[in-house]
C-alpha cells in the first residue's frame, strides 16, 4: 500500500508509530509475532556514518568479502567503492546502501519513508526491481507517482482528520 498526502499530515509519524519509535496518541500498536519489520528511513539515519559500505552490509548478514562485493555490485557499487565510508556518500548512494541492507534483512514487512528521494534514475530502477521482487508486505510513504503506480495495490490518501482507501494497480 502507498500512504500519500500533503506534507505535515503525519505520514512519517504514522510509520514511526508503527515501528514503536513514537507512542500512539491513543490505543496501542500490536505487531504480529511472526512479523519482521524492515525500515527505510527518509534521511538514512539508520546508517553508521563511520562504517564502510561493506561493513554496513556484513553487519546485517555476515558473508565473505567476495560475496559482499558481488552483492553490492547489484546496487551499483564496484571496485574499491565498497570501502568508502558512509559519511562520504551522496544521498542517492546512501539510499542504495539502505536498500541493500533491507534486501538482506529477512523482513516480511517493509515500511518505506520516501525511498525514491535523492535517487538517480539507475538507483530508482534498482529500488523498483527490488521492491517488485519482495515477497512480503510493503507500506510506502511517497510522492513519487511512478513508484506508487508500479507497486501499490492500495492507496491510502491521508488528509487532516481523514484517511481514504483506494484500489491501486
Language-model features, listed with the residues they occupy:
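ABC ATP-binding cassette signature C-motif
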Residues: 1-169
Amino acid at each position: 500500500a502507498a500512504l500519500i498526502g500533503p506534507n505535515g499530515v503525519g505520514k512519517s509519524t504514522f510509520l514511526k508509530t508503527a515501528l514503536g519509535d513514537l507512542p500512539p496518541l491513543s490505543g496501542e500498536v500490536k505487531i504480529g509475532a511472526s512479523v519482521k519489520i524492515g525500515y527505510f528511513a527518509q534521511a538514512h539515519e539508520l546508517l553508521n556514518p563511520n562504517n564502510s559500505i561493506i561493513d554496513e552490509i556484513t553487519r546485517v548478514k555476515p558473508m565473505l568479502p567476495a560475496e559482499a562485493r558481488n552483492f553490492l555490485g547489484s546496487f551499483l557499487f564496484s571496485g574499491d567503492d565498497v570501502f568508502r565510508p558512509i559519511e562520504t556518500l551522496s544521498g542517492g548512494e546512501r539510499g542504495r546502501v539502505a536498500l541493500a541492507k533491507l534486501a538482506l534483512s529477512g523482513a516480511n514487512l517493509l515500511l518505506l519513508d520516501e525511498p525514491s528521494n535523492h535517487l538517480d534514475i539507475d538507483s530508482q530502477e534498482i529500488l523498483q526491481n527490488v521492491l517488485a521482487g519482495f515477497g512480503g508486505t510493503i507500506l510506502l510513504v511517497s510522492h513519487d507517482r511512478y513508484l506508487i503506480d508500479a507497486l501499490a495495490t492500495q492507496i491510502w490518501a491521508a488528509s487532516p482528520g481523514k484517511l481514504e482507501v483506494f484500489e491501486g494497480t
